[in-house]
């Protein structure tokens, strides 16, 4: 199997895993921390907004089965790409959305997708999700991995209570909520 990586942030990483897990070609989705300057940060350190890291997921995929463009299609249906100050009721640096590109192809695809969404006018405000070069990814603690499976009731309550589920449904229907 050929493999590539997509590293994406869209607020709380608990809500960024499930939408990707059932798609063909996606081999794994790992919650973690990306983009900062601290080595091997903990959840508590990242939450202080002093590590430079954001909560993110790193997706391992087979490019012979799915494309980075398909992953971006899913990604943009999981969060509010018009808000760069956090996501829903999670505010601050560690919850900012970011696309971390691994190569020139990913950068171009991300720029094109942003432009396309802005031209389509799906959102009332412009899509402003930053596109940055990938520099690091540190897996989060085990209790954060596959949170939606380990804690389904809390996951559902969090999604609903944060406003994420309502936002996604209002823009995209039930497909990723």
UniProtKB/Swiss-Prot annotation:
Catalytic residues of the enzyme: 12
Enzyme Commission number(s) of this protein: 1.8.4.11
GO biological process: protein modification process
Pfam families xrefs: PMSR (PF01625)
Superkingdom of the organism of origin: Bacteria
Catalytic reaction annotation: L-methionyl-[protein] + [thioredoxin]-disulfide + H2O = L-methionyl-(S)-S-oxide-[protein] + [thioredoxin]-dithiol; [thioredoxin]-disulfide + L-methionine + H2O = L-methionine (S)-S-oxide + [thioredoxin]-dithiol
Stored InterPro entries: Met_Sox_Rdtase_MsrA_dom, Met_Sox_Rdtase_MsrA_sf
Keyword entries, A-Z: Oxidoreductase
Molecular function GO terms recorded: L-methionine:thioredoxin-disulfide S-oxidoreductase activity; peptide-methionine (S)-S-oxide reductase activity
PANTHER family, alphabetized: PEPTIDE METHIONINE SULFOXIDE REDUCTASE, PEPTIDE METHIONINE SULFOXIDE REDUCTASE MSRA 2
Protein name (Swiss-Prot/TrEMBL): Peptide methionine sulfoxide reductase MsrA 2
């Amino acid at each position: 199997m050929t493999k590539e990586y997509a590293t994406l942030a869209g607020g709380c990483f608990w809500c960024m895993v499930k939408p990707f897990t059932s798609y063909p070609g996606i081999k794994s989705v790992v919650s973690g921390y990306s983009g900062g300057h601290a080595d091997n940060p903990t959840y508590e350190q990242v939450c202080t907004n002093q590590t430079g890291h954001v909560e993110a997921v790193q997706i391992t995929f087979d490019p012979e089965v799915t494309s980075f463009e398909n992953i971006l299609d899913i990604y943009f249906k999981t969060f509010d790409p018009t808000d760069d100050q956090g996501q829903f009721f999670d505010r601050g640096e560690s919850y900012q959305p970011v696309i971390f590109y691994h190569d020139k192809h990913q950068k171009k695809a991300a720029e094109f997708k942003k432009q396309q969404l802005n031209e389509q006018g799906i959102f009332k405000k412009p899509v402003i999700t930053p596109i940055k070069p990938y520099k690091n990814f540190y897996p989060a603690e085990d209790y954060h991995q596959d949170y939606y499976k380990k804690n389904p009731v809390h996951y559902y309550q969090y999604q609903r209570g944060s406003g994420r589920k309502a936002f996604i449904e209002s823009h995209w229907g039930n497909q990723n909520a």
